């Protein structure tokens, strides 16, 4: 994911969503890369900052990331305390799952999913 403010974005994924920094790398062309992952997962998200490129503008509804949470109501309250209120939801799906969305830095949207009991 291209970002304009790498450290602010890394801080959000670490401090707000609880992801961990797996590694940092600077490419030969100067791109700064930070790989983050959820605990106990091999899946990684690559955050990329290109210092000599124009500012990134994320198109609305272009993409989003989704994370499963155990207790959406509790997690939403914690997010609100940190300055990230829900932007949509919570909504119960036909399957019984509950979903909600927050706006992350850089214009990306994060979906939170509490699976049906």
Model-derived features: positions:
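N-terminal beta-strand motif that seeds the catalytic metal site of vicinal oxygen chelate
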Residues: 1-8, 62-67, 116-117
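Short glycine-enriched loop/turn motifs at secondary-structure junctions
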Residues: 57-62, 93-94
């Amino acid at each position: 994911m291209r970002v304009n403010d790498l450290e602010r974005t890394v801080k959000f994924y670490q401090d707000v969503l609880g992801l961990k920094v797996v590694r940092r790398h600077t490419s030969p062309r100067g791109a700064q890369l930070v790989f983050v992952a959820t605990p106990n997962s091999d899946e990684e998200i690559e955050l990329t900052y290109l210092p000599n490129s124009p500012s990134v503008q994320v198109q609305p509804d272009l993409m989003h990331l989704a994370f499963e949470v155990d207790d959406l109501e509790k997690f939403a309250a914690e997010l609100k305390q940190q300055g990230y209120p829900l932007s949509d939801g919570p909504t119960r799906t036909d399957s019984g799952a509950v979903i909600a969305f927050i706006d992350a830095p850089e214009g990306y949207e994060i979906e939170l999913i509490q699976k049906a009991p």
